[in-house]
Amino acid sequence: MEIKEIKVGIADMNTAGSPHRLITIGLGSCVGIALYDKVKGIGGLAHIMLPDSTQFSNIKNPVKFADLAVPLLIKDLEKLGVNKRNLKAKIAGGASMFNFSDKSMIMDIGNRNSAAVKKILEKCSVPILSEDLGGNKGRTMIFDTSQGGVKIRTVGMGIKEI
């Protein structure tokens, strides 16, 4: 079987079964969320931009927000036969890509995104197995659904598995 590499854009999500890969690039302050069911060999990847949808009205793309994307991704995985209790998460991104003289939480969107993703995963009872968060460099996330492995390519730092 040919292994497909399925792209996940910014404010996007997708699902795949073994042996395919889900890939998202451009994780700066954004956070990539890989959810995997080892029993079924099925996973999903979301690329969120913002932590919280409650400050917005007329939301056209719910996947942009951590609080909406995670439940939607879980729902899509359940439609494929995944048992939510089997899901495990690996997350990456949440960098501070810009230096501001005001270091307030309002400006630190990367940190806020990371915290929001952790909060919604906990609320959904999905444990986080590993993470690669923070710093000040962009990342690419490569999620291999054959084993649930996630490789992170960080600008200027090479590739590591989380």
Curated annotation (Swiss-Prot):
EC assignment: the record states 3.5.1.44
Keywords (alphabetical) are: Chemotaxis, Hydrolase
Instruction: Give the domain of life.
Output: Bacteria
Q: Which SUPFAM superfamilies match?
A: CNF1/YfiH-like putative cysteine hydrolases
Taken from the record, one Pfam family name reads CheD
Q: Name one GO molecular function term.
A: protein-glutamine glutaminase activity
TM ranges are none
Catalytic activity reported: L-glutaminyl-[protein] + H2O = L-glutamyl-[protein] + NH4(+)
- Name the Gene Ontology biological process terms: chemotaxis
InterPro entries membership:
CheD-like_sf, Chemorcpt_Glu_NH3ase_CheD, Cytotoxic_necrot_fac-like_cat
- The enzyme class is hydrolase
Q: Which Gene3D superfamilies match?
A: 3.30.1330.200
Q: Which PANTHER family match?
A: CHEMORECEPTOR GLUTAMINE DEAMIDASE CHED-RELATED
Q: Say what the protein does.
A: Probably deamidates glutamine residues to glutamate on methyl-accepting chemotaxis receptors (MCPs), playing an important role in chemotaxis.
Q: Which family does it belong to?
A: Belongs to the CheD family.
Instruction: Tell me the protein's name.
Output: Probable chemoreceptor glutamine deamidase CheD
